[in-house]
Design a protein with these regions (language model features):
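Detector for methionine-enriched segments
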Residues: 1-4, 28, 73, 144
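Bacterial Sec-dependent N-terminal signal peptides
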Residues: 1-20
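Residue-level detector of alpha-helical secondary structure
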Residues: 12, 31-34, 66-70
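Sequence/structural signature of beta-propeller domains
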Residues: 25-40, 45-46
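Acidic/His-rich structured neighborhood in mature extracellular/periplasmic domains
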Residues: 40-155
Length: 155
């Protein structure tokens, strides 16, 4: 339960920077609540040894997939309260992969900073950093490329 509350908080944080209307922000919360009874399982995307593909598994989530699914649902049009599967998959791919293009394992956005920047660049997140803090820090992210032996998809 503590994990799901933390995940809900994460979704709310994403909702505050979502470039959508208040109605969409409410959709983030409502979508997140729907995941309360869904088990937390680590590495839910590491299920294939072959070519990178769009994995959708709403029966179990990790920290990242929880937020990705919640945001993809909020960005997708609904009909009779249901999200169209095709729209959901299209939005999920835009969220999860650099510029929405699946081009192998490295095209997946593994670092949250890259994930946020991709969202800002593609218009479904808004950078509110300067509105809340005058302090920013640029970081260089290279752990995965510096340690490829730790990732079977990179070794």
């Amino acid at each position: 339960m503590k994990t799901m509350i933390t995940l809900l908080f994460s979704a709310l944080c994403v909702a505050t920077v979502s470039a959508q209307t208040d109605e969409k922000d409410n959709a983030m919360l409502n979508n997140g609540i729907n995941f309360l009874d869904i088990p937390y399982v680590a590495h839910t995307l590491e299920v294939t040894d072959g070519e990178e593909e769009l994995i959708i598994n709403c029966d179990e989530v990790d920290c990242t997939t929880f937020v990705e699914y919640t945001l993809a649902m909020a960005l997708s049009p609904t009909e009779d309260g249901q999200v169209a599967e095709g729209d959901f998959a299209t939005n999920l791919q835009k969220i999860r992969y650099r510029d929405g293009k699946i081009n192998g394992y490295p095209s997946r956005l593994h670092y949250i900073a890259d994930w946020v920047n991709n969202g800002i660049r593609n218009g479904f997140l808004e950078d509110v950093t300067t509105a809340y803090s005058p302090y920013t820090q640029k970081v260089s992210l290279s752990y995965m490329s510096s340690h490829p032996e730790l990732y079977k998809q990179l070794s």
